[in-house]
Amino acid sequence: MFFRNLTLFRFPTSLDFSQIDSILPNARLRPVGPLEMTSRGFISPFGREEQEVLNQRQGDFLWLTVGSEDKILPASVVNDLLTRKCSEIEEKKGHPPGGRERKRIKDDLIHELLPRAFVKNSRIDAMLDLRYGYVAVDTASRKAAETVISEIRDLLGSFPALPLNAEISIRSMLTSWIAGEPLPEHLNLGDECEMKDATEGGAIIKCQHQALRCEEIDKHLEVGKQVSKLALILDDHVSFVLGDDLVIRKLKFLDGMLDQLEHSDTDGIRAELDARFALMSAEIRRLFLLLEVPLKLSKANN
């Protein structure tokens, strides 16, 4: 259940979430219709089979899950059928169908195929920290994260959440850390980084499974390369890769945190998920607050 990536947004802490339990049922995921391509809505964080609990609230943390049902209709299948249909028309009429007729035929084919198309189920989780006003969406895709924010906005009627940004150059800060400048307290370098030329379209160097403070890295820095992604470790609790787009990738919870889970009193799957969410949300908050000051992260207007 642990999140693996974090795309972050800020929102005003003055927002009221007290009615969340009463409004969520109206935004529940409904099955995709026979002639629909997709359906989105909220599902229980504890799984689609759970019908009563559509969110999880622990203190200032709120866990929401957006579920999707998407029809799988490969373009190659549609295009093959379209080619056959157009060939049949050309044989009968002596000329191929025009652009407008071709589009109509394609729409008719899609309309015919949709009820028989396979349905792909997916989910994206989000954690809202109501005290500090940020959303952590479990995806590295900005587009997918925006979809979740849009669903929350539709749910609440208004949700002025904005993508996280910084008042400084993230590349410059990451580069300074790898060059030897002090890191924020409790953070250490990992064993992975990506470096890019300052010029657009320049060389990209990817380093993995190696010490980052070394002669090889220094040579890249000397010729002007800047760090665009950097692996970091928060104590022995969390490892992650921070990008210059402020997306946190490859999020992994380490033994220092997991040991707490092993010693917690959990009885059953639901209790274990509650315990995991409590530990994970606390670590994500600690990480967020640790990065907020040195990176001068944006705040939302209340």
From Swiss-Prot:
Keyword flag Plastid: no
Q: Which Pfam families match?
A: RdgC
Instruction: List S-S links within the chain.
Output: none
BP terms from Gene Ontology: DNA recombination; regulation of DNA recombination
Compartment(s) where it occurs, according to its Swiss-Prot or TrEMBL record: Cytoplasm, Nucleoid
- Sorted alphabetically, which keywords does the UniProt record give? Cytoplasm, DNA recombination
Q: Name one GO cellular component term.
A: cytoplasm
Keyword Cytoplasm assigned to the entry: answer is yes
Molecular function GO terms recorded: double-stranded DNA binding
Q: What is its main location?
A: cytoplasm
The record's annotation in InterPro entries points to: RdgC (IPR007476)
NCBIfam families attached to this UniProt entry: PRK00321.1-5 (NF001464), PRK00321.1-6 (NF001465)
The family note in this entry says: Belongs to the RdgC family.
Q: What does this protein do?
A: May be involved in recombination.
Q: What is this protein called?
A: Recombination-associated protein RdgC
Tell me the organism.
Xylella fastidiosa (strain Temecula1 / ATCC 700964)
